[in-house]
């Protein structure tokens, strides 16, 4: 048994009995555990057990091989591959003679062309931020930038314009320019230019289509009613004259045709029928089988001869006695 245990320790293997779970009663003395495990003791240094005013470094500086900002060289390579298998004439019906990806000219400096201040490059110890030790003043004077302020530089117009890189040789080539349009620098102010009246006036009566519409598109409808100031309130309405039949009527079975009466003039102000909306009209409307004749509206206003609600003097009837006579009748006592 001792030799086998030594062999297992040398080879790094656990004994067979230790890997199996033992069942049953075990004594209370220290024995070898039935389940293998790996124990790892964690050692806490004394520097981390300190509470306030701890001088332990929170951010230790680790050295690695990764270069910092501004310490590497960027090489811009063309993404277009010069492979022999690619056809120079293209693969479409009308091949283009220009490159698909133009050379990109960067307008900004490269990553290693910046001048970074030394304050940003220098490493600081942030572990002393909450300590009671003496520290250097953290507020420093702002650096004066050498770049121009707004409205103090002339932006190049050539960079803002759109470049015309259309160099295709298609079968149906468009003659429309793809670049920016040239606008006039100075234009006439409002009211100082001539409008082409041919666009405003009615078009001539020429054949434009098979079924041309004759409806006017720009004319306003004339009003059929009278305008303001046309009414005369003092003038009375004229009664149309009756048409007289001729003296020698023609012998017909039907009566003589009479002309239509003329249209009455439009009513002026004050000639309309004004409806009294204060008193609503009474309409007894009901859908029941027994229609009630009781008015559902407010009562009529009181007349001047009727008494008011406080002019009555009601008399309470007193007690009265009755006698029961021989005829079995009740007789009131006087």
UniProtKB/Swiss-Prot annotation:
UniProt key word Cytoplasm: yes
Example of a GO biological process term: positive regulation of apoptotic process
Pfam families (UniProt xref): SHIPPO-rpt (PF07004)
Keywords: Apoptosis, Cytoplasm, Nucleus, Phosphoprotein, Repeat
Compartments (UniProt record): Cytoplasm; Nucleus
InterPro entries: SHIPPO-rpt (IPR010736)
Role according to the record: May positively contribute to the induction of apoptosis triggered by O(6)-methylguanine.
Designated name of the protein: O(6)-methylguanine-induced apoptosis 2
Native source species: Homo sapiens
């Amino acid at each position: 048994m001792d030799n086998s245990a030594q062999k297992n320790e040398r080879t790094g293997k656990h004994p067979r009995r230790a890997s199996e779970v033992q069942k049953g009663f075990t004594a209370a003395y220290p024995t070898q555990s039935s389940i293998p495990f790996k124990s790892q003791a964690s050692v806490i240094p004394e520097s981390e057990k300190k509470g306030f005013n701890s001088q332990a470094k929170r951010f230790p500086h680790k050295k690695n091989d990764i270069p910092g900002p501004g310490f590497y060289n960027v090489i811009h390579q063309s993404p277009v591959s010069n492979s022999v298998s690619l056809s120079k004439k293209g693969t479409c019906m009308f091949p283009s003679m220009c490159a698909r990806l133009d050379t990109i000219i960067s307008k900004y400096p490269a990553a290693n062309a910046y001048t970074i201040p030394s304050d940003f490059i220098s490493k600081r110890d942030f572990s002393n931020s909450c300590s009671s030790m003496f520290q250097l003043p953290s507020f420093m004077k702002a650096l004066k930038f050498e770049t121009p302020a707004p409205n103090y530089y002339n932006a190049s117009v050539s960079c803002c314009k759109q470049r015309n890189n259309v160099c295709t040789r298609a079968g149906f080539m468009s003659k429309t320019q793809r670049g920016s349009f040239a606008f006039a620098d100075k234009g006439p102010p409002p009211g100082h230019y001539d409008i082409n009246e041919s666009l405003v006036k009615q078009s001539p009566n020429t054949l434009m289509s098979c079924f041309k519409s004759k409806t006017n598109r720009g004319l306003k409808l004339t009003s059929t009613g009278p305008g303001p100031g046309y009414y005369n309130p003092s003038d009375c309405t004229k009664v149309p004259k009756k048409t007289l039949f001729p003296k020698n009527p023609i012998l017909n079975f039907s009566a003589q045709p009479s002309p239509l009466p003329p249209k009455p003039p439009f009513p002026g102000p004050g000639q309309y029928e004004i409806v009294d909306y204060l008193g609503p009209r009474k309409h007894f409307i009901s859908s029941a089988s027994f229609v009630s004749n009781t008015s559902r509206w407010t009562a009529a206003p009181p007349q001047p001869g009727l008494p008011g609600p406080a002019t009555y003097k009601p008399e309470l009837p007193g007690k009265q006695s009755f006698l029961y006579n021989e005829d079995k009748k009740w007789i009131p006592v006087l």
